[in-house]
Design a protein with these regions (language model features):
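Short polar/charged helix/loop
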Residues: 1-148
Length: 148
């Protein structure tokens, strides 16, 4: 099966999922990659600490600077070929929004030593840096597995 439409999901869509979106998107240029939250702060920009960590790692900030949090919808779930979530509890949250999406929902950290990627919201910069590395490692693995 081809996974051409990838949706990355966290809680609020202001920290982890937008960062993962902007890490994975350039590695899979032929795929549609987007992000959303199960309890999104709709319209809220990316957390300033996320932008700071992205800047320090020389990521393209164009998408993060204009990011507006999106609420996960049943339609988004049906559109996606693969839904990558940050924590095991998000698998159930996705299924509650769209039961048909359960079979295509996996943990972003599935292939890493630590499957759950903790929420960095309202945490210090050192925690953001740790979470960044977990997300970057997971995205690198997924990019290799999904490369066509």
């Amino acid at each position: 099966m081809r996974y051409d439409k990838i949706l990355i999901v966290c809680a609020g869509n202001i920290c982890r999922s937008p960062l993962a979106e902007h890490l994975l998107k350039p590695q899979l240029p032929d795929c549609f990659v987007a992000s959303a939250g199960v309890t999104a702060w709709v319209g809220q920009g990316a957390d300033p600490k996320v932008i700071d960590v992205a800047r320090r790692h020389h990521l393209d900030l164009s998408g993060l600077n204009g990011h507006g949090a999106k609420q996960l919808t049943p339609q988004m779930c049906l559109f996606a070929d693969l839904i990558l979530v940050m924590e095991e509890q998000h698998i159930g949250a996705v299924a509650a929004i769209q039961p048909l999406a359960r079979s295509k929902t996996m943990l972003l950290g599935q292939w890493t030593g630590q499957k759950n990627i903790p929420d960095s919201y309202r945490r210090d910069q050192a925690f953001f840096d740790k979470v960044y590395q977990q997300i970057a490692d997971a995205c690198n693995i997924w990019a290799k597995k999904l490369s066509h």
